[in-house]
Amino acid sequence: MKDLVKFLKAQSKSNDDFDVIKIGLASPDKIRSWSFGEVKKPETINYRTFKPERDGLFCARIFGPVKDYECLCGKYKRLKHRGVICEKCGVEVTQTKVRRDRMGHIELACPVAHIWFLKSLPSRIGLILDMPLRDIERVLYFESYVVTEPGMTDLEKNQLLTEEQFLDAEERWGDEFEAKMGAEGIQALLRDMDLEHQCEMMREELQETNSETKRKKITKRLKLLEAFQQSGNKPEWMVMTVLPVLPPDLRPLVPLDGGRFATSDLNDLYRRVINRNNRLKRLLDLVAPDIIVRNEKRMLQKSVDALLDNGRRGRAITGSNKRPLKSLADMIKGKQGRFRQNLLGKRVDYSGRSVITVGPYLHLHQCGLPKKMALELFRPFIYSKLESRGIASTIKAAKKMVEREEPIVWDILAEVIREHPILLNRAPTLHRLGIQAFEPILIEGKAIQLHPLVCAAFNADFDGDQMAVHVPLTLEAQLEARALMMSTNNVLSPASGDPIIVPSQDVVLGLYYMTREKVNAKGEGMYFLDPREAEKAYRTGQAELHARVKVRITEHVKNEAGELVAETKLLDTTIGRAILWMIAPKGMPFKVFNQTLGKKAISKLINESYRRLGLKESVILADQIMYTGFAYAARSGASVGIDDMVIPAQKHEIIRAAEAEVAEIQEQFNSGLVTAGERYNKVIDIWAAANERVAKAMMENLSTEEVINREGNPEKQASFNSIFMMADSGARGSAAQIRQLAGMRGLMARPDGSIIETPITANFREGLNVLQYFISTHGARKGLADTALKTANSGYLTRRLVDVAQDLVITEDDCGTHEGIVMTPLIEGGDVKEALRDRVLGRVVAEDVLKPGTEEVLIPRNTLIDEKWCDVIDAESVDVIKVRSVVTCNTDFGVCAKCYGRDLARGHLINQGEAVGVIAAQSIGEPGTQLTMRTFHIGGAASAAAKESSIQVKNAGTIKLTNAKFVTNKEGKIVLTSRNTELTVIDTFGRTKENYKVPYGAVLSKNDGAEVAVGEVVANWDPHTMPVISEVSGRIQFSDIVDGLTVTRQTDELTGLSSIVVQDVGERATAGKDLRPALRLVDAQGNDILIPGTDVAAQYFLPGKAIVTLDDGAEIEVGEALARIPQESVGTKDITGGLPRVADLFEARKPKEPAILAEISGIVSFGKETKGKRRLVITPAEGEAFEEMIPKWRQLNVFEGEMVQRGDVISDGAETPHDILRLRGVHAVTDYIVNEVQEVYRLQGVKINDKHIEVIVRQMLRKAVITNAYDSEFLEGEQVEVSRVKIANRKRAEEGKPLVEFERELLGITKASLATESFISAASFQETTRVLTEAAVAGKRDELRGLKENVIVGRLIPAGTGFAYHQARAKKRSQPEQAVAFEAPVAKANGFATDADIEAEFEFVADDATQSLAALLNAGDEE
């Protein structure tokens, strides 16, 4: 028995000691070396005896015995014959398990090209031979000959010959040359490749060539050839002569009842190959006619293709049921493939699932577990306890007792469960809070009870949701569950750092009701000794809950030394608030409780508690708040009745007025005064305004009521209307929903997003008529359809994000960089979108922050900014801070803790080993389902914002203009002549309060540096037309303005004024094509006037559609408009919103009509125009001018002679992130992506920290393109990981060589995932075949750095608790002699069973996981 145990141990010790996985091409010899014998027959098993046929696909001699330790003929049975090979049937006596890993092989009668290297684009064989895929296919499938050895003839190598040409050549030259057909020909060509010589030639060619396309092509080919050279793969191995056969247990054949068999598709495919191969061998032996042999070879090629990748070429081979057979490639790719189905996600034992119900009496760390479930889940633990106590003699007896559910079993179950945490998971697990640990409480019934406060994290409700339970078995797993996953340790959300354990719904309503005050309630004005007395008064009915009273409150406040000091004061409060104060922990101020508590206030309260008192107190407080909230929600008796929906009296009046206005607009339309579009927009604006007015009247009506106070005078107070209370507290519902209940439903949208102009004037209390109901079905159904689509899309986005960021882990404490990104408050228009304190909270300062206006250091470099520092920033009114960021972090693999900053879910500097990439991906993906799917049309209600025509400031302060060029008109007002001018209002402390974009041609009433008062209008402009502003005074002279040729005259019927409209180039007659209509300004003598400060003449070219109202020779003053260009195109552009917008940003997609940016700084001019385009020329102060062709229909933001800076917008449109990166750098593109993504989430009210988006941006920027390689290992134009270039450059700097020059490249997340260094990770993501093909040809090595790779090979991940294990491994690798010491104590660590124990209990087998975890624990000890 002893040696059996040793033998078993040896068997289980798998080859786990590798650090790299290399993939390559298998040579024929390699395949033979794996093989245990050749499969010669297509037979599988004998259908009578069910024994495998000899030499067949399931042959026991090749693949091993069918029964454990028993040969096929039955001569040798039992363990004692282990290792004997039976002389009769030739089967080795061993475990059946070997049938899972012993391979066979098939000797192919002729070579066959591997379809992956042929058809997976770009074709590797094609690339290496430099032949088109078409040609190679014609050779392979026997349509043409290829010349393999031209000899002395005038044929060329690799030349294709048709049958006729081949015969002609043979007649002409005899056997001077060699030409072959089929895979043999291709193999011969590949074998003759001289890689070194080819590489040298390519390098020379690369030096000489100038054409960009040729360069790219050569680089591609060169990379492939070099990969072949370095990896030791030989090109001819891409053509197979030996085919490996998968072990039989991986392609099983199972007899069903009724004499039929269920089989894996692979067996059919292998059978086909063997049949054809054998037939071909026979034909070759018989020396059959060429055409027959060829046909057979072609069929063999096709059957091998189908085996490897069915359906890749031609039609897929189908089985008996018309379904394509599942080939080897299909086994590994896709959601059901090996990677995603079995390696990345496995099903686990010790789990159960059930419906969830509420457990309002539980503590936060508890959950209710049905007894039945617990008994089943903790079975083994119960068995072992029963046995060790001597209650049951054997495991079998224990099993019986448990099945009979004897009373003692329940006692033992309770003991086992004590302090054994379990994991609860609700699908879909969108972020890490979707799995949390709880301590089980045994309950009757069959539903799991869940604590109400963790519902937000799980996104659970109790309308039938189910949850899964998992039991952590090993000590280590229990430890992790308790220390890291316990619900009490996850109070803050990792996405935003705000509390996620926040009361909602009933609890909020209860607390809100409890803390409201009421005028003249019973007991008003009483005095109480302490909150206990106030409660007594309430319980005995002496005072109402809402009564305003004075209570003596004892607060415990921290003093300077940090000790709690008691302070007692008599304070104004209400009974309810005093009662609530009784649950407050010491150290919280009373003012936090002494207010009406809505949802936001409660969230703040818990946050405050967490920051002041720490985790434990906050969790206790949260629980107490919940119990109190439920109790008082029940007492409040708040409910919804139809009379609570009070319809405002003014409603009918408002609607009547709106209808009258609409009728008036319709009149105007009928008489032709307004266009159809204008009428539609105006009607929608009227109804939107009416809706607002009704809503306002309704809310005023609902939210306040008039009561008589103690003095007998009327006084307004907030109403106790149930519906209003629910919305006001944030418990349920919103003003928008109440508006539909008691106001009017308003405008509805069609499914395409356009707004129906007849609104629904009724509300739900009045009820809708048929027409109104019909209109509203549109929106409702669209909502449902959207939701279904949204879930799938959001899940896919999350998957892509996780994939791109999965290997980003905190690997060191400080990378030492001085770089960072500059943070300022986000201000749009007159309101601060996000204050500076919120943006820098939890970040590390990159360089000293100085006190504004002095040289004194306020915050030193490398300080982590916490709440206290934020107060300092506010007090000193700092408005710009440079903070460290993940994007600028210098760590090679991973990120450093200082560049990341605070761990949002814990509130301190992040620990090493934290998987920040995955957290970022989850934080961005999880709210994805809340984002909308639709694209917004600016139309009607939405366009109110777009049509601004003036700026009215909200704060007093000083005006500051940036990027401003202007002229002063005769009234002394300033007229802007620059494009992207920004107007900022700065307060007395120098803080930016407001920020506006001002368009070209706006008239400003204040200059730079002027003071403004609140509500002053500082700028106005015409929103519908863009003027052309004259920068000088003079006389107008028309140039190229010819009636009927370049312009048309229009006379306005109403006013009788005539104007000239410039025609578009496309609409002009041929004679007018080259004319360029312009207005020139001349002085009295007719000479050109120069624009001040330049030597450019003042002439203004007019684009198509421009309207000129002045006549030739008219006098004009400076700052007046020469012409106007109508801006009608603005109203129709779609704004992509919601989820698709986020996906577009992360995929770095180029928009349809991207903004055109200036590539260099210089002066703009226009060159010769072509048919549909105009030529833009930018001439810099020195160096080459830059030319670009721009389509005519693009509206340009620049006139001729204007000066632009590199990266300025020349033509409006959506900016392309690639352009921003190229022209403005990494910081600008980070800013752009972060702000754009945040914009979408902010609209939905979702809070995500910028850090997470930056993490993804870092991953999108991890590749660079080499622009100057010097003599390094890189090629120019090659795409390389930035970290690799940096490492190489550090080395080169030490050697004093010039540094390799590179440009950062922005990749979309899908591209970036596929371009990762690790081929295992890329293959398990998408396009498995392509990734594996590429990796195999290049002989890639996977260093197993990321998380996915390690999960796939079954290791601990190099993050979290596995981080130490991997560091220990790395240490061990560098000092091999200590390896023994590291391995030795493994067995003792967990007190694993000794040999004797195993003999007694033969059923127990230790698995690898427990061993590796034990090793992990030791790794920690050793360090």
Curated annotation (Swiss-Prot):
SMART domains reported in the protein's UniProt record: RPOLA_N
Amino-acid positions noted as binding Zn(2+) 1 in the UniProt annotation, renumbered to this chain: 71, 73, 86, 89
Keyword Transcription attributed: yes
Keywords for the protein's UniProt record, in alphabetical order: DNA-directed RNA polymerase, Magnesium, Metal-binding, Nucleotidyltransferase, Transcription, Transferase, Zinc
Binding site for Mg(2+): 461, 463, 465
Residues the entry annotates as binding Zn(2+) 2: 815, 889, 896, 899
Cofactor notes: Binds 1 Mg(2+) ion per subunit.
Subunit structure and binding partners: The RNAP catalytic core consists of 2 alpha, 1 beta, 1 beta' and 1 omega subunit. When a sigma factor is associated with the core the holoenzyme is formed, which can initiate transcription.
Cited function: DNA-dependent RNA polymerase catalyzes the transcription of DNA into RNA using the four ribonucleoside triphosphates as substrates.
Family listed: Belongs to the RNA polymerase beta' chain family.
Protein name, per record: DNA-directed RNA polymerase subunit beta'
Originating organism: Actinobacillus pleuropneumoniae serotype 3 (strain JL03)
